[in-house]
């Protein structure tokens, strides 16, 4: 159930592609009314600050069980900062799941840490080329401009940016000659076109894009933020870089571009093994069901 009607979005497109039923509410009041009409036996599981606050309050008033997953480690600014505070403050009305330890430490109540998870593709990407990618929302907290700056220091790389957002026009104007912007894409059709994923976020929880890339055998070079610090084993399945240090990331990207097939194959397999051992669907669904039954 989606809180607001934003028309056809990347998320609703994916829901349709997967054949998953969903309801789109017209506003917050409609969302709460629809939740309240659900049978008492229904368990509500919320994601995101708006659905979380409204869902927990509705569940409290109607006596329903509610579980909330907290994904973001970013406090935000302005109105978003207030919403983030309200989200954490109302966490006491729910059983809470945090996708990383740093996020769990920010919550005022005990929570269960369950990392994000992804399915394992049958075959990995080849990672034999020079295609470097950013995948995510083109907004300040994701730092897409830092990714675009890498292109100037890595002349042998082909830089591809996947995603939409408020910074798209500015990025296209400033970096369009060095970085190819693809807009939003169904990444299931794109991972085979990528050899290395770079994450330049200022804040993160545990981004699904990192898990998806590694499940495909694509190593990740990332700023050391949020749950990525625990996911990435530096120089084994990817690389960790001090946040904001673009030149240091460029050195690692250039190392990858110069590396031979043996090095790439070893790191690709290490990335897949990491996901298979700790971040696959089978590992996490049981943990979530345990929270439901607690």
Predicted segments with their positions:
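Short His-centered aromatic/hydrophobic patch
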Residues: 46-54, 70
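Conserved acidic donor-binding segment of nucleotide-sugar-dependent glycosyltransferases
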Residues: 234-235, 239-246, 255-261
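Short hydrophobic beta-strand element within catalytic cores of glycosyltransferases
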Residues: 2, 219-222, 232
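Aromatic "clamp/platform" in nucleotide-sugar-dependent glycosyltransferases that forms part
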Residues: 202
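N-terminal strand-loop element at the rim of the active site
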Residues: 1-29, 165-167
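A conserved mid-protein helix/loop that constitutes part of the nucleotide-sugar donor-binding site
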Residues: 130, 134-153, 161, 166-170, ...
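Nucleotide-activated donor-binding/catalytic signature segment of Leloir-type glycosyltransferases, i.e.
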Residues: 170-185
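Carbohydrate-associated surface elements
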Residues: 102, 117
């Amino acid at each position: 159930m989606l809180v607001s009607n934003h028309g056809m979005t990347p998320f609703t497109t994916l829901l349709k592609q997967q054949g998953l039923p969903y309801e789109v509410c017209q506003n917050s009041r409609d969302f709460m009314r629809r939740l309240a009409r659900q049978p008492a036996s229904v368990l509500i599981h919320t994601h995101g600050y708006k659905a979380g606050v409204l869902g927990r309050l509705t569940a409290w008033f109607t006596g329903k069980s509610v579980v909330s997953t907290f994904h973001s480690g970013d406090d935000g600014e302005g109105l978003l900062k207030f919403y983030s505070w309200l989200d954490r403050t109302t966490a006491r009305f729910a059983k809470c799941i945090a996708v990383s330890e740093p996020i769990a430490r920010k919550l005022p109540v005990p929570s269960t840490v369950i990392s994000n998870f992804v399915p394992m593709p049958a075959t990995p990407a080849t990672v034999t080329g020079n295609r470097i990618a950013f995948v995510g929302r083109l907004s300040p907290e994701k730092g897409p401009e830092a990714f675009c700056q890498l292109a100037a220091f890595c002349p042998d790389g082909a830089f591809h940016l996947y995603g939409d957002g408020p910074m798209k026009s500015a990025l296209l104007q400033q970096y369009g000659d060095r970085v190819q912007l693809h807009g939003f894409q169904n990444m299931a059709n794109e991972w085979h076109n990528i050899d290395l994923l770079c994450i330049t976020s200022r804040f993160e929880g545990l981004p699904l894009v990192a898990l998806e890339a590694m499940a495909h055998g694509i190593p990740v070079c990332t700023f050391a933020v949020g749950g990525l610090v625990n996911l990435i084993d530096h120089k084994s399945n990817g690389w960790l870089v001090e946040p904001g240090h673009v030149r240091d990331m460029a050195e690692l990207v250039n190392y990858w571009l110069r590396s031979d097939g043996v090095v790439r194959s070893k790191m690709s397999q290490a990335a897949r093994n990491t996901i298979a051992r700790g971040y696959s669907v089978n590992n996490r669904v049981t943990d979530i069901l345990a929270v439901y039954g607690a």
